[in-house]
A protein has these predicted regions:
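Accessory RNA 3′-end/elbow-binding domains used by RNA modification enzymes
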Residues: 1-38, 43-65, 137, 177, ...
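RNA pseudouridine synthases
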Residues: 1-199
C-alpha cells in the first residue's frame, strides 16, 4: 500500500508492525491461521479439531472464514477468539479456485474455451440441492475464468469470483451450455480475500507440533510463524492511519480529518477503508468522505464514516 503522509508527521515514528510484537497469549487471542485444508473433513470439523489442539492455551473459540466442501482443498482461514469479529470481511471477499471440470462428451478445445468465456461477468445461479442456504436464484459475479489445460475430457479451470459462487454448479451449467454435460471432479481454493496459497499455508500437523512446542518446551517460534495478527485480513484494503487523537479512546461514528496522519493514495470519495492507529492495530472499517489528498490536508471535517468498530479486538498499546 502506498501512503500519502500528513505534512509535519514523522512517518518513521509510526510502528505499523506492532501487532506482530505482542505477547504470544495476546496474539492467540486475536490471531488467524491460514490452513491448507485437506480432502475429507468438513470445514466445521477442521475448526473443531484445531480448537482441541489449542487446549491448554487461551484459545477457546475457533471459527473459519468460508466453508469448503469436504472434498475441496486449499485456503481455509481459521479465526481465533476475537478474530471472529472480522469473519464477515473474509466471508464477503473475492475468492479464487482451481478445479478440474470433466466433460461428459468429446468437445474440441476451441469450442470449450469459447463457451467458458461466456460465463465471465454476472451469472445467475441456483444453489445445489444439498446447499445449506435457500435454493433461490441469485446473481454472482465471475471476474475471470481461464482454461489452464485441457486433456481429453478433463479441463483445468481457474476461476476468480464473488463470494457465494458455487463452482461445482458453475461447471454443471457450463456443461449444459456446451451441450454434453459436465461435473467438477477436483477443487482447490487458491485465494480468499487478501490471502493466497503462496503466503505460507500450514497443515493440521504443523499446528499441532507448534502448539506442543510452546506448551511443552516454551518455544513459541513455530507458533508465531503460523498465527498471524488479525490485521492481516486488511492487507490488500485501502487504509487510513489515525494518530493519538483518533485512537485514544472509543471512536465516534465518524473520523475527523485532523486525526488522519496517512491515507492510501488509491482512496476516493466513497472508498471502503480499514482504519488503523499509528501502531498498526485495526480500529474500524469506514467509508471515506473524500479522496486521499484531501484526507491528509483538509482541516476539521468528516474524513470517513464508520461502518463497523473493532473495539472488541482491542487497541493494545
Amino acid at each position: 500500500v502506498n501512503f500519502l503522509i500528513r505534512k509535519g508527521f514523522d512517518w518513521d515514528s509510526a510502528r505499523l508492525g506492532r501487532p506482530r510484537e505482542v505477547p504470544i497469549e495476546v496474539l492467540l487471542d486475536r490471531g488467524i491461521v491460514l490452513l491448507d485444508k485437506e480432502d475429507g473433513p468438513t470445514s466445521h470439523d477442521v475448526a473443531a479439531t484445531v480448537k482441541r489442539m489449542f487446549e491448554g492455551t487461551v484459545v477457546f473459540k475457533v471459527g473459519h472464514g468460508g466453508t469448503l466442501d469436504p472434498a475441496a482443498t486449499g485456503i481455509l482461514p481459521l479465526l481465533l477468539n476475537k478474530a471472529a469479529l472480522v469473519q464477515d470481511v473474509i466471508l464477503s471477499s473475492r475468492k479464487e479456485y482451481v478445479g478440474i471440470m470433466h466433460l461428459h462428451g468429446d468437445v474440441p478445445e476451441a469450442n470449450v474455451e469459447s463457451m467458458v468465456k461466456t460465463f465471465t461477468g454476472p451469472i445467475f445461479q441456483r444453489p445445489p440441492d444439498r446447499s445449506a442456504v435457500a435454493r433461490v436464484v441469485r446473481i454472482r459475479q465471475i471476474e475471470q475464468i481461464d482454461i489452464l489445460e485441457q486433456v481429453g475430457r478433463d479441463v483445468l479451470l481457474r476461476v476468480a469470483c464473488e463470494a457465494g459462487t458455487y463452482v461445482r454448479k458453475l461447471c454443471v451449467d457450463i456443461g449444459e451450455a456446451i451441450g454434453c454435460g459436465a461435473h467438477l471432479t477436483e477443487l482447490r481454493r487458491t485465494r480468499s480475500g487478501c490471502f493466497s496459497e503462496s503466503q505460507g499455508l500450514v497443515t493440521l500437523g504443523e499446528i499441532g507440533l507448534a502448539v506442543a512446542a510452546w506448551l511443552d518446551d516454551g518455544d513459541e517460534t513455530s507458533l508465531r510463524r503460523i498465527v498471524h495478527p488479525v490485521e492481516r485480513v486488511f492487507d490488500c484494503h485501502p487504509a487510513i492511519v489515525v494518530g493519538a487523537r483518533g485512537s485514544g479512546g472509543p471512536l465516534p461514528r465518524a473520523i475527523d480529518t485532523g486525526t488522519v496522519i496517512a491515507a492510501s493514495d488509491s482512496i476516493e470519495n466513497g472508498t471502503e477503508v480499514a482504519v488503523f492507529d499509528e501502531n498498526g492495530f485495526i480500529l474500524a472499517r469506514a467509508t471515506a468522505a473524500m479522496p486521499a489528498a484531501a484526507l491528509i490536508e483538509a482541516p476539521g471535517t468528516v474524513a470517513a464514516k464508520i461502518i463497523k468498530l473493532y473495539a472488541g479486538i482491542g487497541n493494545l498499546v
